[in-house]
Amino acid sequence: IAEAEDAVKIQFWKAEFIAVNYDVTWCIEECRRYGTLNSYMVFLYAAYHDKKISTEELYQYLDEIDKLKLCESNGQFQYYLKMLLQPLQDAYINDPSKCIRIATIEIEFCFCLEWNNMKCFKIEINRNPKFLSDLIAIVFRKDHMESVEQDDSEKNRISNLYRLYHKIGFCPTEKGGVIKEDDLEAWIQQFRKFLKENDQSSLFGMVVGRLFAFSPVGDDGHRPCEAVRNMIEKYADKSMQSEYAVTIFNRRGVHSPTAGSAEKKIAQGFQDNADYLALNGYPKTAEIYYSLARTYNSESTREREEAENGRF
């Protein structure tokens, strides 16, 4: 195959095989040059799995993947991508420059990764909120700019990044279930500054409200944690409160009908949480949970009536 014409090499190297029986460096370079991203990932996985390349070499080879063409995002490609990212994330998550590069790869292929597979992207958002503000600048319109025409490629890119935005599921500066208030406020102030620079200040409440909905529980056993409560009381507007509530509501996902009994129980839990927050000096945060209680009480009534009318 080394002496074959380019057309033959292209056909050979686009095949997704995993045997690594020859000079590994030569094979990888040939696959990168003539193959597809799909075949390249399969070959890299085989080489790494067979311990024929090191983690550092794997990093160098993956640094080239944006030069290759993806045939299609199938389940096999997603599997090999996750398996190759994992050792790199483990090895370089504390190496700032390499972590950033791995994060950009995670972003590039966000359409086939779940949030928990995007470890470096999460770390980089925690380190620097500009990572998130740059994403916001792409997927949302500026406050004082008319919409512009986009070609299909750009529309597809924005669509993928919009889905990435909705995959993000963490509260800023959280480490091991703990959030330090000073760290959180510093992050918030930086993020707000970057939004202002991007002419997107109006999005502050919506974006931060969504992130706050992923807060860990507080030391007192109530949600959100104390640091997030204090930030809500200090910075919240209606958009922040609304987006927090909507995010909590949407996280329930698909569920089986119970004629309203499950919704009634959920509503009571939110009501109890809200009452506690209100009694302890968190009125804005309490209102979020009161609104959730009202929503679930309405859902409970609707489902009970549908059950009584034989719609289940």
What are these regions (language model features)?
Residues 259-271:
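Short amphipathic alpha-helical heptad-repeat segments
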Residues 22, 274, 280-284, 288:
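Short helix-adjacent coil turns
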Residues 1-249:
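Non-catalytic all-alpha helical scaffold/repeat segments
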Residues 14, 207-211, 266, 273, ...:
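Structural register within alpha-helical repeat arrays
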Residues 235, 239, 277-278, 296-297, ...:
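Alpha-helical junction/boundary sensor with strong preference for TPR arrays
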Residues 256, 263-264, 282-283:
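Inter-repeat boundary and helix-capping residues of tandem alpha-helical solenoids
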Residues 284-310:
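Short, charge-rich amphipathic alpha-helical segments embedded
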